[in-house]
Amino acid sequence: MRKLVRMDFFFYGTLLDEDVRRLVLGPEAARLGLVPARLPGYRRVAKGYSSVPLLARRSGASVEGLLACGLDCRQAARLRHYEGRDYRLARCKVRLADGRACAAMVYLGQGRIPLPRGSWRLGEWQRRSKPAFLKLAALWLAAYRQAGYETRGRVRWVKRWAARD
């Protein structure tokens, strides 16, 4: 019998938006366990050339977000496609409201990080950029489905990550 792999992810940017989560993760997004959490040692900044955020290390700072509990391999693979090559997956410790720490997967900027344009705020992004962003994200994810990744199960990397300590 195959072992069902489930992973927890920390969302700090566009995935805080319910419509984006539903687009990326599918209808199952509504059933995700979402818990308020914060990631210490980072701050959320606006990426220099786009409307999406990234995390920059900063001692004493922390980023508020959501811990999404129990994503399956297919959802994790869709997340990987959504995040693209500008981000890398890392395991970090997040803090829950009651002070407990727990491990979560987080997408961090990869390679040389462009100069940040200041803080990134969800409400501002939703007012200014969300409608156009949703259209582009829908096209990006349609390309993922057309490539057959949904049915071929390109999720081995997820199982490798889940097995790491």
How should each PLM-predicted stretch be described?
Residues 2-165:
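Glycine-aromatic micro-motifs
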